[in-house]
Amino acid sequence: MNIDLGLFISFFGIFFFYSLILYFAAPRKTITLKEIYISILAGIASISVLQFTYAFLPNQVTYNEFNEFMYVVAPREELSKFIMFLLVTTWISKKRKIKPVGYMIISCAVALGFALEENMHYYLKYGEHVLSVRNVSAMPAHMFFGGIIGYWYAVGKLNIGKFGGRINLGQWFVKSRLTIYSTIGLFCASLMHGIWNYSLSFYSKMINAIMDSIPKVMALPVFNNGWLPITLFAVFILLFLMRILYRDLIRLEKEKQDYIKE
C-alpha cells in the first residue's frame, strides 16, 4: 500500500500542529487533549448541520459574490459551528466547570475541525495544491472566527458583580445576557468571515492580474498564486487580534477570582 507522505503531512500535519498549539498555549487545567479532539470531531460533524441549513433554508438572497459571502456562506457556517460548540460545552460542563478561556479554545477547536473537513472538500474538487494555501489561510482564519464566538460566550458567562455589566445590554437584560452576548459573537464572527472571504476573492484576482503582467519576476512557484501575500498578511492580523481576546479572557478570569475572594 503506497502512501503519499507529502499529501498526508499537508493534510494532517498542519492540522495536528494547530491542535497542539491550542493545547499547549492554554493555561493549566483549562482543557485536555481529549476534549480538544472531541471538539474537532464535533467541528467535522458541523458540516452535516451546514448541509441541513441549505436543505431546509434555501438561499433567498439575490446572487452576487458579496451577498453570497456576507449573507449566505458566512452566517450559515458560523451558526453550524456554534451549534456543535454548544453541544460540546454542554457535554464537558456535565463533568466539570469550564474556565472562560476554555470556551474560546473549544470554539477554536470546533472551527479547526470544520476547516479540516472543508479542506477535504476542496482537495477532492481542486487537487492537492490547494492544501498548502488553505493550511496557512482557511484553518487559522476559521479558528479566529470561532475564537470570536467563544470569547463573547465566555464573557456572557462572567456574570458576577461588575462582570454582569461588561456592556450596557448585560445590565438591562440580565436573564438573557448569555443569549445576547452569543448573538453578538455570532454577528461579529459572521461579519469578519464574510469580509475575509470577499476580500481574498477580490484582491487575489487583482494580484493574479498583476502577476500575469510580470511573468519573469513572478515565475517562481511561491508567487504563482495571488492568495499568498494577502493571506499571510491577513492571518498575521487575525492572530494578533486573537491574542488580544485570549489575554483579555485570562485577565477577566483573574479579576473575577480576586472579586470572589473579596
Predicted regions and their residues:
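Hydrophobic alpha-helical segments at protein termini of multi-pass membrane proteins
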Residues: M1-E262
